[in-house]
Regions:
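Helix-to-loop junction immediately C-terminal to a conserved catalytic motif
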Residues: 52
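ABC ATPase NBD coupling module
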Residues: 68-82, 106-108, 132, 222-226
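Conserved ABC ATPase "signature" region
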Residues: 111-126, 179
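ABC ATPase C-loop
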Residues: 127, 148-149
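Conserved ABC ATPase signature
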Residues: 131-135, 139-141
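A short, proline-enriched helix->beta-strand linker immediately N-terminal to the Walker B motif
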Residues: 150-154
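Conserved ABC ATPase "signature" C-loop
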Residues: 210-211
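ABC ATPase "signature
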Residues: 216-217, 225
Length: 248
């Protein structure tokens, strides 16, 4: 068995009396695409952020390629991980190229291949000279993905990265993310509230409820009825929407 790309070993995170993450153990194999789904407040984003140490566990540990993420400085760890979130946080005074290249620049690494990165996220190369204010929301998210890829990261953490986008742009970006995952041999963990998105993009779907993982199944297994009550309640939403649309 290969060493898991990410391993959660009995990870918990408490805020006072509240367990946001409650004793979770989970392996994410290399090149897997895992979606974390669940209702708001179920602990998805908190669990994700324990990987890049934006959240420190109250108990347990997280391993990246077999090494404890807490073993070294957090900034060094984050250079190995791509992270894209809903409000992508581009620097408004910098050009697109400068935003994309900031990680390697801070690390003292050679400049990334800007043309290749823009091609990967399907942005015109001329956009390198633009500033974030000149971009649409979808274009800014594409820049965010390029920035996450610039240091050569093989692990991508996506925290509701497409949540603020219109449905057409969201679908296009989701498809491109899955293509990049396959083309570049990435390991991807995606937090999403959209069950249809999870089923269409992921190779595994982990369902969270009250800080615990209550189901861990393939999309096909979930669609066939596996995973239990909480998982099937989420699967029922896109199914019901499809039935209602068919009846119009």
């Amino acid at each position: 068995m290969p060493t898991p790309a990410v391993r959660f070993e009995r990870v918990s995170k408490r805020y006072g009396e509240v367990a946001a993450v409650d004793d979770i153990s989970l392996d994410v194999e290399p090149r897997a695409f895992v979606a974390l789904v669940g209702r708001s407040g179920s602990g998805k984003s908190t669990l994700l952020k324990t990987v890049n140490r934006l959240v420190e566990p109250s108990a347990g540990r997280v391993l990246l390629d077999g090494e404890d993420v807490a073993a070294g400085p957090a900034p060094m760890l984050r250079r190995r991980i791509g992270y894209v979130f809903q409000h992508v946080g581009l620097f408004p005074h910098m050009t697109v190229a400068e935003n994309i290249a900031i990680g390697p620049r801070i690390a003292g690494s050679p400049p990334p291949d800007m043309a290749r990165l823009l091609d990967l996220v399907e942005l015109p190369r001329a956009f390198a000279a633009r500033r974030p204010a000149e971009l649409s929301g979808g274009q800014r998210q594409r820049v965010g993905i390029a920035r996450a890829l610039a240091p050569g990261a093989k692990l991508m953490l996506m925290d509701e990265a497409f949540g603020a986008l219109d449905p057409v742009t969201r679908d296009a970006l989701g498809r491109r993310l899955r293509d990049l995952h396959d083309e570049l041999g990435l390991t991807t963990i995606l937090v999403t509230h959209d069950m249809a998105e999870a089923l269409l993009l992921a190779t595994r779907v982990a369902v969270m409820e009250e800080g615990r993982i209550v189901a861990d199944e393939t999309p096909a297994a979930l669609l066939a009825g596996a995973g239990g009550e909480a998982a099937q309640a989420l699967v029922a939403v896109p199914r019901d929407q499809a039935r209602r649309l068919a009846g119009l």
